[in-house]
Amino acid sequence: MELMKRNAVYIFVLISLCLLACSTIGIPNTYGLFYQPLSQILNVGKASATLHVSIAGLATGFSSPLIVKALKKVSCRTVMIIGILMLCLSGYVIGTVQNIMLVNIMGIFRGIGLACTSNVIITILTGNWYKARRGTISGLIMSFSGIMGSLFSPVVSAMLQNYGFRNAYLICAFIMFILALPAVFIPLRPEDVNMEPYGNDRVDIQDKDSYEGYYELSFTGKVFLTLMTTSFLVICVTTLTSYLPSYVESLNQSAQNGAALLSASMVGNVLFKFLIGISIDKKGVFFSFVTFMFISFLGLMVITFIPQNTAMLMVAGVIYGACYAVNKVAVPLTVRIFFGDGKYGEAYSVLSLCENIARSAIITIIGFIYDTSGSYLICFLIALVASLASSALMLYQQKTIKQ
């Protein structure tokens, strides 16, 4: 009976984290569909319409290290509740407001809300609750963000057409709220409820990678800076996702094709996150990083140079989605391997800050490049180079560890 209760708790935590990933990662991945109608409603340029996304990213990044420190003083439940309330407030205001300035202010609230509920919190909870099969479990949880994005993109597109921007945005905010609620009941650590992490008694995971790490954490050291650069290059690739619908429309294809490409990338998001988790458990994080980044590179090549063939474009969208797996599964597990469980929260929160600064800047830069040149080609070419460069840096880091 006791074993059944423990297993039930592990399953509840897993399901709640999957739903949280749907809410705070999956739904925001569909926000690219809102850029065009928002710019039209407020009569502003594409760069101005996406500025609140950049602001939210910066707020998430700067808040994440503070949230990790706050978890030492307040309960995880309190942090979650504050985050969910801020997401609800920002969603309501952005969905009803007529002023771009207020939209940008709400970007700060949304960013803090995401810091309390999104990537950093999800990966910390995953690491605290699951010691065995971390790659597979991390991949499964993060794949649900892709499931939500894949299923929800055409739904959002239909809501925009039938109900308009404001109602569609409010519905999305409400769904985020509902999906995030179960995670409020997850304790920060299983020890807080007199339990042990799943797989804690397995001999095969009592290794240096899982607990101690290979390096001492230094934010100005060569290891962290190289990892930060690698992560930045991956972000250069993943950030294009928000602009896939606009990119397709700029090629004089229908908005439905744009939504379909975004949905296809979310299918790849789901598939490759799950596969990379299994691959990491079997082949290691370095092999998996390089392999899946190259897969994404192939998809991006087709999207960039052969976008006229709709069938090929959709297949390429799926393949391109492998970059999500690298960003959301391989990079966090690399941080854990490098610096160990004890320093993971501190290290990944700072890396997340750097990622969000990069993502925010890149989103705005892409919008600016399009507004000034009328084309997304330069952005896609940069992403192709970044794909190869990130893999080269990861191979370099692997060589350094072996030495």
Predicted features and spans:
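C-terminal transmembrane helical hairpin of 12-TM major facilitator-type secondary transporters
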Residues: 280-334
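Cytoplasmic helix-loop-helix junction between adjacent transmembrane helices
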Residues: 108-143
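Extracytoplasmic gate region of multi-pass secondary transporters
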Residues: 31-35, 219-276
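Intracellular juxtamembrane helix-capping segments at the cytosolic ends
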Residues: 38, 116-130, 326-339
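Conserved MFS/SLC helix-loop-helix module at the cytosolic interface between two early adjacent transmembrane helices
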Residues: 62-100
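Extracytoplasmic
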Residues: 12-37, 42-46, 63-67, 152-153, ...
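A late C-terminal transmembrane helix in Major Facilitator Superfamily
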Residues: 149, 338-373
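Helix-to-loop junctions at the C-terminal end of transmembrane segments
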Residues: 63-75, 273-284, 370-371
